[in-house]
Amino acid sequence: MDPCDCAKTGTCNCGATCKCTNCQCTTCKKSCCTCCPSGCSKCASGCVCKGNSCGSSCCQ
């Protein structure tokens, strides 16, 4: 459970102690960090979401 790589303005740790702030993970673990907009019901593995936009490949 490696930490997510987040934007410089945010922090994200998907380890045992899950903490996410302004998270824009490039590797999203939905169970830990809600990195995609609320409209996304599920994050695809390895999806990349920027800001409030979410590509079709990100949501399943």
From Swiss-Prot:
Q: Which domain of life is it from?
A: Eukaryota
Q: Which residues are noted in the entry as a divalent metal cation 1-binding?
A: 4, 6, 20, 23
Q: Summarize where a divalent metal cation 5 binds, as residue positions.
A: 33, 35-36, 49
Gene3D superfamilies xref list? Metallothionein Isoform II
Segments for region (Beta):
1-28
Q: Which residues bind a divalent metal cation 3?
A: 14, 18, 23, 28
The segment annotated Alpha runs over: 29-60
Q: Which UniProt keywords apply?
A: Metal-binding, Metal-thiolate cluster
Q: Which residues bind a divalent metal cation 2?
A: 6, 12, 14, 25
One term of GO molecular function: metal ion binding
In this chain, a divalent metal cation 4 is annotated as bound at 32-33, 43, 47
Which residues take part in binding a divalent metal cation 7?
A: 49, 54, 58-59
Q: Which SUPFAM superfamilies match?
A: Metallothionein
**By its UniProt entry, which Pfam families does this protein fall under?**
Metallothio (PF00131)
The record lists a divalent metal cation 6 as bound by 36, 40, 43, 59
The protein's job, in short, is: Metallothioneins have a high content of cysteine residues that bind various heavy metals.
Q: Which family does it belong to?
A: Belongs to the metallothionein superfamily. Type 1 family.
Domain comment? Class I metallothioneins contain 2 metal-binding domains: four divalent ions are chelated within cluster A of the alpha domain and are coordinated via cysteinyl thiolate bridges to 11 cysteine ligands. Cluster B, the corresponding region within the beta domain, can ligate three divalent ions to 9 cysteines.
- Please report the name of this protein according to its UniProt entry: Metallothionein
**Organism from which the protein derives:** Rutilus rutilus
